[in-house]
């Protein structure tokens, strides 16, 4: 089954949705995301996710391209169109696609953010052994900043100081 996805204000079949190769989410991981669980066809704690999304966007000085009411409607429509009973809605907002790659943040009046939402069907999510009994976890050191020798696309710390 081909899913319906949401991209920049429009619904597309997933194989028809296209994003610029210059999108900063793709080139620099300059984006925020949220994942909202769906159980029994209903969004779980949508308000909490929307609040965290707004806080994340504010912290990165990114503009929010969609209102709370519109975002809720899009989530509900995607759940409906894709017949999601148990699963999730993934949302990502990037700083957009300026005309070229640059560390300097694009002018938000000249470059619109890119907003993408899609669903994933996860049947049995609520009744999985992990959901019922929990999972074991371990903690490990975060080595991201100690491994600057690896050229990853996560360049958040590169653009930030330039805009100070």
Task: Write out the residue ranges for each language-model feature.
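Active-site microenvironments in enzyme catalytic cores
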Residues: 37, 81, 92-94
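Acidic pyrophosphate-coordinating catalytic loop
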Residues: 80, 98-109
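Short, glycine/charge-rich beta-strand/loop segments that flank catalytic centers
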Residues: 67-76, 86-102
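Helix-start/capping segments and mature chain N-termini
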Residues: 1-77, 106-158
């Amino acid at each position: 089954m081909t899913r319906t996805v949401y991209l920049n204000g429009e619904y597309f079949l997933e194989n028809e949705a296209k994003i610029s190769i210059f999108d900063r989410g793709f080139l620099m991981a300059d984006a925020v995301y949220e994942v909202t669980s769906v159980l029994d066809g209903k969004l779980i704690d949508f308000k909490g996710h929307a609040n965290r999304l707004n806080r994340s966007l504010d912290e990165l000085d990114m503009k929010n391209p969609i209102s709370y009411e519109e975002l809720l409607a899009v989530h509900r429509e995607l759940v409906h169109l894709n017949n999601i009973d148990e699963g999730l809605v993934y949302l990502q907002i990037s700083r957009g696609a300026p005309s070229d790659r640059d560390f300097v943040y694009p002018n938000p009046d000249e470059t619109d953010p890119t907003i993408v939402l899609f669903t994933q069907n996860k049947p049995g999510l609520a009744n999985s052994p992990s959901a019922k009994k929990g999972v074991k976890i371990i903690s490990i050191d975060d080595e991201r900043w100690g491994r600057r020798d690896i050229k990853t696309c996560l360049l958040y710390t590169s653009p930030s100081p330039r805009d100070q």
